[in-house]
Swiss-Prot record:
This protein's name: Consomatin Mao1
Swiss-Prot/TrEMBL keywords: D-amino acid, Disulfide bond, G-protein coupled receptor impairing toxin, Hydroxylation, Secreted, Signal, Toxin
Family (UniProt): Belongs to the conotoxin C superfamily. Consomatin family.
Origin: domain of life: Eukaryota
Misc note: This peptide is an evolutionarily optimized stable analog of somatostatin. In addition, it adopts nearly identical conformations as in the somatostatin drug analog Octreotide. As this drug, it contains a D-Trp at the same position, whose synthesis is a common strategy used for enhancing the metabolic stability of compounds in drug design. Consomatins evolved by gene duplication of a 'Somatostatin and related peptides (SSRP)' gene expressed in the snail neuroendocrine system.
Cystine pairings recorded for this chain: 65-70
GO molecular function, one term: toxin activity
Chain positions found as 4-hydroxyproline: 71-72, 74
Length: 82
């Protein structure tokens, strides 16, 4: 919880610091997003997938669990217990 609070404070400072130097909010927000990310690119990536994406998804096992009961597989211990 402390880490989340710290991250929130840092994000607020990161956004508001340029504003105190005379920047406009819209310019600050645009500065947080890479230039090559556009709504068209986002929509295209949602609807059109490369064939390799579906092959990768079909070979990776999907773990559907609650966080406290079954953490994601990369974080599981080698002995298979919790």
């Amino acid at each position: 919880m402390q880490t989340a609070s710290w991250v929130m404070v840092m994000m607020m400072v990161w956004i508001t610091a340029p504003l105190s130097e005379g920047g406009k909010l819209n310019d600050v927000i645009r500065g947080l997003v890479p230039d090559d990310v556009t709504p068209q690119l986002i929509l295209r990536s949602l609807f059109f997938h490369r064939p390799s994406d579906s092959v990768v998804r079909s070979t990776v096992p999907v773990h559907i669990c609650y966080w406290k009961v079954c953490p994601p597989s990369p974080w599981r211990r080698p002995n298979g217990k919790g």
